[in-house]
């Protein structure tokens, strides 16, 4: 009931799950919807999946009690296969302990595409938004075939298009701007830290 109400109140939340420590990290409760705003479903026990092989399970299991883990932004997968149409998500999870022992975790999948599209609409309409992860892999690109291409074996990165951005991502400079002869900004690049340590 609590998980269902959480999805009702947060339209961008796609899944709320309790994943146990036992049985290869099997989901014990999963409430989900296919897309933001779509109908909410409670998954039948026969369709619950083991998740111990996923990065977010291992990272969350290793955290201290009460410490939130934020996953990389990637495409949602079901049974190990990228879901179609593509569904970019970020996962927030927290471990559950009892008497000092790890018992499982609560995991929330959040649809991140609406946030990307909002960012693309703010500011000057003539600007084009590119978003990457820390490796320079595209999360959002004007050519949609390059967005999340790394999830399907693609190797095209921001360094291919804008080599100077490497100095921002490796931390050697805080930001990069390229100006035209008339002083107009042609390219602006900045790292925005986002992870569990940025939650305060």
Feature locations, PLM:
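Soluble or luminal CAZymes and related metallo-dependent hydrolases
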Residues: 1, 48, 52, 167-168
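Solvent-exposed, extracytoplasmic
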Residues: 2-9, 43, 79, 101, ...
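Short N-terminal helix-loop-first-beta-strand/juxtamembrane motif that initiates sensory/input modules
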Residues: 8-34, 51, 62-69, 120-140, ...
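Exposed loop/turn and edge beta-strand positions of beta-sandwich/beta-sheet ligand-binding modules
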Residues: 12, 85-90, 125, 183
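Core beta-strand residues in small-molecule sensory/regulatory alpha/beta domains
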Residues: 19, 95-97, 132, 193-196
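Extracytoplasmic/periplasmic ligand-binding sensor regions of membrane-associated signaling proteins
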Residues: 33-110, 117-118
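Short, surface-exposed beta-strand-loop junctions and turns on beta-sheet-rich folds
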Residues: 33-36, 145-148, 195
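Extracellular/periplasmic juxtamembrane segments that couple receptor/chemosensory ectodomains to their
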Residues: 101, 155-200
């Amino acid at each position: 009931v609590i998980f269902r109400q959480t999805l009702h109140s947060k339209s961008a939340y796609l899944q709320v799950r309790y994943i146990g420590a036992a049985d290869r990290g099997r989901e014990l409760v999963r409430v989900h919807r296919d897309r933001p705003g779509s109908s909410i479903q409670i998954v039948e026990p026969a369709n619950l999946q083991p998740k111990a092989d996923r990065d977010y399970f291992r990272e969350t299991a290793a955290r201290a009690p009460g410490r939130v883990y934020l996953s990389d932004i990637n495409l949602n997968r079901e049974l190990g296969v990228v879901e179609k149409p593509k569904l970019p998500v970020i996962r927030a999870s927290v471990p559950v302990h009892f008497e000092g022992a790890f018992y499982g975790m609560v995991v929330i999948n959040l649809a991140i595409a609406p946030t990307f599209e909002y960012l693309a609409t703010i500011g000057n309409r003539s600007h084009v938004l590119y978003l990457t992860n820390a490796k320079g892999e595209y999360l959002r690109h004007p050519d949609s075939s390059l967005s999340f291409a790394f999830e399907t074996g693609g190797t095209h990165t921001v360094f291919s298009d804008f080599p100077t951005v490497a100095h921002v991502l490796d931390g050697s400079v805080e930001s990069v701007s390229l100006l035209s002869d008339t002083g107009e900004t042609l390219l602006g690049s900045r790292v925005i830290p986002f992870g569990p340590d940025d939650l305060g």
